């Protein structure tokens, strides 16, 4: 885990006893940001607040959406990798990343690259196998793309989406 916001609900709301939890937030192999070959590469454990300055320059609408994504404290620990791995239907980053044709690197016994649109298998179900994790998110940087994100929620900030839409082209 990095932020652990979804996992915490497993304990507090469902009373699940989680025996093996590993903190990945300080793992340097999962905590990085770099631009290479017209792509933004983000380590899966990189906090949302660390990503914001890059997104503000590349995709301002995406950055603006993240400013409504939880409190400052949550954005300091929450990660896109965690948001994707939980496969929550209310995850705000998934529609944007899919609209941008993003990919993820999954690592376990083997390493594989997967288009994000093929990663989700159903409600809280993904392609991840036992002993695999999301290592990296790859977002294409295309100056010809336009991106608009729209989030509707009961409260303006720090609330789950009732409706979320991302359009790119």
Cite the ranges covered by each PLM segment.
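C-terminal structural segment of proteins
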Residues: 1-169
């Amino acid at each position: 885990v990095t932020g652990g916001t979804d996992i915490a609900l497993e304990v507090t709301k469902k009373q699940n006893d989680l025996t093996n939890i590993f903190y990945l937030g300080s793992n340097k192999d999962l905590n990085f940001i770099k631009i290479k070959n017209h792509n933004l590469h983000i380590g899966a454990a990189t906090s949302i607040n660390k990503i914001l300055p890059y997104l503000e320059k590349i995709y301002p609408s995406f950055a603006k959406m993240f400013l409504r994504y939880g409190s400052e404290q949550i954005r300091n620990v929450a990660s896109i990798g965690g948001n994707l791995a939980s496969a929550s239907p209310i995850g705000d980053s998934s529609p944007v990343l899919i609209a941008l044709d993003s990919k993820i690197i999954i690592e376990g016994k083997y390493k594989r690259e997967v288009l994000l649109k093929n990663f989700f298998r159903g409600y809280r179900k993904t392609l991840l196998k036992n002993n695999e994790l999301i290592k990296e998110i790859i977002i294409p940087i295309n100056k010809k793309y336009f991106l608009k994100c729209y989030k509707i929620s009961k409260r303006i900030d720090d609330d789950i989406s009732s409706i979320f839409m991302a359009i790119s082209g």
